[in-house]
């Protein structure tokens, strides 16, 4: 009887860990695109979030740019990536239904319509001189979203990196 209880408890803990790992991710900031808010090497806790719950001003993690576009230096494109499968960290500037921010996003100056279309986001780095973002690429599709940054993780409290 006691062994069955221990087994059930262990199974419950294992399921909780799996669920947490699917909902949360720790990402290491690389590059200078989010200075001064986030510095290279800092780690942030990210919660998986559906695109429809985003608001302008939130910091998000999205799948990144696969490679530099023509005219960009590859080093600058690589600096935009976080750890994991090419994550980037950016601040949401506009969500579907918001006015297109033509004055701050040159790539969208000639975009059709007056509102950000459904399924698209406008994201910007806090440090424009070192950020590959919507200023150059225009809209990013919302399906690239992983989640919202909840907080920085204190390096002293986090587990050692491998």
Give the role of each language-model region.
Residues 1-162:
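Extended hydrophobic leader/signal-anchor segments used for secretion and membrane insertion
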């Amino acid at each position: 009887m006691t062994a069955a209880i221990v087994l059930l408890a262990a199974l419950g803990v294992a399921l909780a860990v799996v669920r947490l790992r699917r909902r949360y991710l720790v990402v290491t900031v690389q590059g200078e695109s989010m200075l001064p808010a986030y510095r290279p090497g800092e780690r942030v806790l990210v919660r998986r979030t559906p695109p429809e719950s985003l608001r302008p001003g939130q910091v998000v993690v999205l799948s990144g740019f696969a490679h530099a576009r023509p005219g960009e230096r590859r080093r600058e494109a690589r600096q935009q990536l976080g750890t994991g499968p090419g994550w980037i960290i950016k601040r949401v500037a506009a969500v579907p239904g918001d006015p297109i921010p033509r004055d701050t996003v040159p790539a969208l100056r000639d975009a059709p319509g007056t509102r950000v279309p459904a399924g698209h986001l406008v994201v910007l780095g806090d440090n424009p001189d070192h950020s590959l973002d919507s200023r150059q690429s225009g809209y990013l599709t919302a399906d690239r979203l992983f989640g919202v940054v909840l907080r920085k993780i204190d390096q002293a409290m986090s587990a050692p990196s491998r």
